[in-house]
């Protein structure tokens, strides 16, 4: 699915958190959002997901305006920073509860995504998860429905080198399947290694757009 921001601004109270953003994200590529904490990366993801709507301008998903033509994208997986799950449930049960909302995801698919993120053999309750395990479960939740749009906000936080490689492999696989992937990451080199294009964000404004050199 393609995504377009047309003259998009967002105010929270008296603060302008996104200011006149105009970008187009093509279908089936990996796009990075680069910037310091509070720059507007997460806010842009929330706008794409339909969790909030633009104060001015339009966020357009495949030609349809969010908040006007559609309430939210029809096929989207989202992992915002610090994902929250039920503390008394294990990973499988948390994902099964989410899957039950649509009732279209089989137990075998849940087992598969837990295997993909390295949590298949772990039966701990979520409250006993390490930060890295919580990140892994958040990624699993974002990809288990095989969505057309995948938003990953700082997916490599709290992950060791092997976990970061796992994220790279997942992103590459989702791109190969045709998904539009948008992610943020504090590590510029890691972000560039995963992305086809990167938008730099400062104080809610796009200040640069470039294609990473991967040679």
Where are these regions (language model features)?
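The feature captures the beta-strand-to-loop junction immediately N-terminal to the Walker
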Residues: 34-36
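Helix-to-loop junction immediately C-terminal to a conserved catalytic motif
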Residues: 49
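Conserved ABC transporter NBD signature motif
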Residues: 57-72
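Conserved ABC ATPase "signature" region
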Residues: 96, 107-122
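Catalytic Walker B motif of ABC-type/P-loop ATPase nucleotide-binding domains
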Residues: 150-154
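H-loop/switch region of ABC-family ATPase nucleotide-binding domains
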Residues: 185-186
